[in-house]
Curated annotation (Swiss-Prot):
The organism of origin for this protein: Rhodopseudomonas palustris (strain BisB5)
Active site location: 11, 130
This protein's record includes keyword Amino-acid biosynthesis: yes
The enzyme's E.C. designation: 4.3.2.10
Name listed for the protein in its UniProt record: Imidazole glycerol phosphate synthase subunit HisF
Entry keyword annotation includes tRNA processing: no
Length: 255
């Protein structure tokens, strides 16, 4: 049986870890490399770096942060933000990233996903989907550019399409729940997870440890991502994993 993964997410803006509510109102949470080293020591299964300004403000990729993290950490690292070309992916992988997350560029040009998967293998290509519920309907729309730009694209159909093109994993964030601490958008998570044959990482809204369990058990995700509950010391990675084990979920526990 697969082991459920617990993945801290480090949103990085101007070289600092930040955490906000609904993609805005950002507050500082520390140095990204120091945070990565701490999470590695704490037993995180993976780490996700997202440069949340890279696409919006056309910034380059934070290669120095990636390089220093890869040198210091054993856990797999996924990096996203400002990834627009095959060369961007190559540079990140050479800098030490294990997987690369594509967001706005995949929406703008679906074939980019296919090109990336064919060149580097689907195991290292993650498509990040930021979705918001369409009012009054069981439908979710994709937003890009750090959640600033609506697309009119249906999230479920898009997920199925990018998986058919070679995406090896979906990183799914509910913009309605992001930073609210009210739990994952379970209907959205389940709808995406049940519609594709690749791992789905649930993201957006974790406020307590039960929410992590719900993402797997009710949302059918294969991994859960959280930020603020870990960044500000409310819970440790070990506490999260122990709680999930008590709930009957298969976890990797370090000695």
């Amino acid at each position: 049986m697969f082991k459920v993964r617990v993945i801290p997410c480090l949103d990085v803006k101007d070289g600092r870890v930040v955490k906000g509510v609904n993609f805005v109102d950002l507050r500082d949470a520390g140095d990204p490399v120091e945070a990565a080293i701490a999470y590695d020591a704490a037993g995180a299964d993976e780490l996700c770096f997202l440069d949340i300004t890279a696409t919006h403000e056309n910034r380059g990729i934070m290669l120095d942060v990636v390089r220093r993290t890869a040198e210091a950490c054993f856990m797999p690292v996924t990096v996203g933000g400002g990834v627009r070309t095959v060369d961007d992916i190559k540079t990140l992988l050479r800098s030490g990233a294990d997987k690369v997350s594509i967001n706005s560029a995949a929406v703008a040009r679906r074939e980019f996903v296919k090109e990336a998967a064919e060149k580097f293998g689907d195991q290292c290509i993650v498509v990040a989907i930021d979705a918001k519920r369409v009012p009054g309907r069981d439908r979710w729309e994709i937003f890009t550019h750090g959640g600033r730009k609506g697309t009119g694209i249906d999230a479920i159909e898009f997920a199925q399409e990018v998986v058919s093109l070679g995406a090896g994993e979906i990183l799914l964030t509910s913009m309605d729940r992001d930073g609210t601490r009210s739990g994952f958008d379970i209907p959205l998570t389940r709808a995406i997870a049940d519609s594709v044959q690749v791992p789905v990482i649930a993201s957006g809204g974790v406020g307590d440890l039960d929410h992590l369990v719900d993402g797997i058990r009710e949302g059918h995700a294969t991994a859960v991502l959280a930020a603020s509950i870990f960044h500000f010391g409310e819970y440790t990675i070990r506490e999260a994993k122990d709680h999930m084990v008590r709930a009957g979920l298969p976890m990797r526990l370090d000695p």
